[in-house]
A protein has these predicted regions:
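Short helix-initiation/N-cap motifs at beta->coil->alpha
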Residues: 68-79, 99, 169-174, 249-263
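Conserved N-terminal structural module of periplasmic/extracytoplasmic solute-binding proteins
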Residues: 4-102, 121, 285, 300-301, ...
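Paired acidic/hydrophobic, glycine-rich loop segments that form the ligand-binding mouth/hinge
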Residues: 92-95, 268-273
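Extracytoplasmic/periplasmic solute-binding protein
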Residues: 135-136, 140-144, 149, 173-222, ...
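A structural signal for short loop-to-beta-strand junctions that line the ligand-binding cleft
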Residues: 81-83, 89-92, 120-157, 189, ...
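C-terminal lobe and pocket-closing loops
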Residues: 273-288, 297-396, 426
């Protein structure tokens, strides 16, 4: 998830966010400049600009320079790590994939926010989002936007052929074959998902493992604790491509490539995030009024499918020279007011459950209550400081299985050996 460059003057909304008594104090008397690193928000409009203007009008004593991070999450993390490791990163507030919080906190790169937050402040957010902001009982970040993996489907095509949204992957495959045979459209793809070698591929595989009733890390720390089921998941994903149920370019596909193809009416099913829902309903969208939402399916060996929950948090660099201003900015952008503005833009979904049932927002975005329920049913990626090592080790192995360079059995065996060695060296 990633965003356009804004350079705006901002200010610390202490009164608005209620942190006047609990914020750390900056020294000096003149305006301070806070550098905010964020990624481009994917949606119909960018909500940051009006929020930053509002913030600047309230508090002209703080100047905020908002700067865009690279496009992909892997490149974002690389940029942040390189700069944070030097101890003088050149930015104060950063947008974080929530899965990075334990790693960044353990490395000493984040300011511990616990002393500066009123008790219970994180209780207004989804429990999974609040938990992702914590490490070893301390609060290291503030939840900003929420994500969950969803199944999008062409409701018009399913209705035309007397089908319901699939609850299993066997039903999804059968629906693709039935609809394509009846439609006679050689350009109509079946199931779009993210198979490029990056974090998105790991997420898709994690969801496949959950759908099969297994996971990547066992309670005892074993990698792929049920190797046979893991191999079956990889065979299924590879088979989607080789059997033409997913396009051959799946192995180079990310969120935007798949979202655009589905949005042009070129596929029956899509695995993606909530941001896509509002883009499909734009006035000029070829699929407007034709798209439904459902949970991700399950495999025959599983009891239920589950989308990966995630999203973005805001953290404050431990080396900031302006902690009061930085925390004020982070609290403003994650406040109920700011999350409402962001939700109204259609760019992102909030981390505050109450907004999913707000009458005005539901009128504008009828899918919100459904997304709320699917978010509650989702599952987080493994919460561990070693997650990035887990992900970066898995990415080439999983990609090799998808393109047929390795068999699923080889991928699972090689991944287990490498990861168990690395994780043991890190103490898990």
């Amino acid at each position: 998830m990633t965003r356009p460059i804004l350079v705006v003057c901002l200010a610390g909304a202490l009164a608005l966010t209620g942190c006047a008594d609990s914020s750390p104090r900056d020294g000096g008397g003149g305006p301070v400049t806070v550098v905010f690193k964020h990624a481009k928000l994917l949606g119909p409009v960018d909500p940051l600009a009006p929020l930053l203007v509002e913030f600047a009008a309230l508090h002209p004593e703080i100047r905020v320079r908002a700067e865009a991070l690279p496009w992909s999450s892997d490149e974002q993390r690389q940029f942040l790590v390189i700069n944070l490791e030097g101890g003088n990163p050149g930015f104060d507030v950063m947008m974080l994939d929530c899965i990075w919080v334990p790693e960044f906190a353990r490395a000493g790169w984040l300011l511990d926010l616990t002393p500066f937050l009123p008790p219970g402040e994180l209780a207004a957010h989804f429990p999974s989002a609040a938990e992702a902001a914590r490490y070893r009982g301390r609060d290291w970040a503030l939840p900003w936007m929420m994500n969950v993996g969803l199944l999008y489907y062409r409701a018009d095509l399913l209705a035309r052929h007397g089908l319901r949204p699939p609850e299993t992957y066997d039903e999804l495959v059968a629906a693709i074959r039935r609809i394509r045979a009846a439609e006679g459209n050689p350009r109509l793809e079946g199931y779009l998902w993210q198979g490029k070698q990056y974090e998105g591929l790991v997420v898709n595989v994690l969801e496949g493992l959950w759908a099969a009733g297994t996971r990547v890390l066992g309670d005892d720390g074993r990698v792929f604790p049920d190797p046979e089921r893991a191999e079956a998941v990889l065979r299924f994903l590879r088979g989607l491509i080789t059997e033409g149920l997913s396009p051959p370019w799946t192995t180079a596909a990310d969120e935007e490539i798949t979202r655009r193809a589905f949005g042009q009416g070129e596929a029956i099913f899509l695995r993606s995030w909530p941001y896509a829902a509002d883009l499909f309903e734009l006035p000029d969208s070829p699929v407007r009024g034709k798209v439904g939402l459902a949970p991700l399916p399950r495999h025959a060996t599983g009891t239920a499918g589950a989308g990966s929950t995630g999203g973005a948090h805001l953290g404050v660099a431990r080396g900031t020279r302006h902690p009061e201003a930085a925390i004020t900015l982070a609290r403003f952008l994650t406040s109920e007011r700011a999350q409402r503005v962001m939700a109204e833009s259609g760019a992102v979904k909030p981390t505050r459950p109450a907004l999913y049932h707000d009458p005005a927002l539901v009128r504008a975005f009828p899918s919100l209550p459904r997304i709320h329920d699917l978010t509650l049913a989702g599952r987080p990626r493994p919460v561990t400081p070693a997650y990035v090592i887990l992900s970066t080790t898995l990415q080439p192995e999983l990609s090799a299985a998808l393109v047929g360079v390795k068999t699923p059995a080889e991928t699972v065996a090689h991944s287990r050996r490498r990861l168990e060695f690395l994780l043991e060296g890190l103490g898990g």
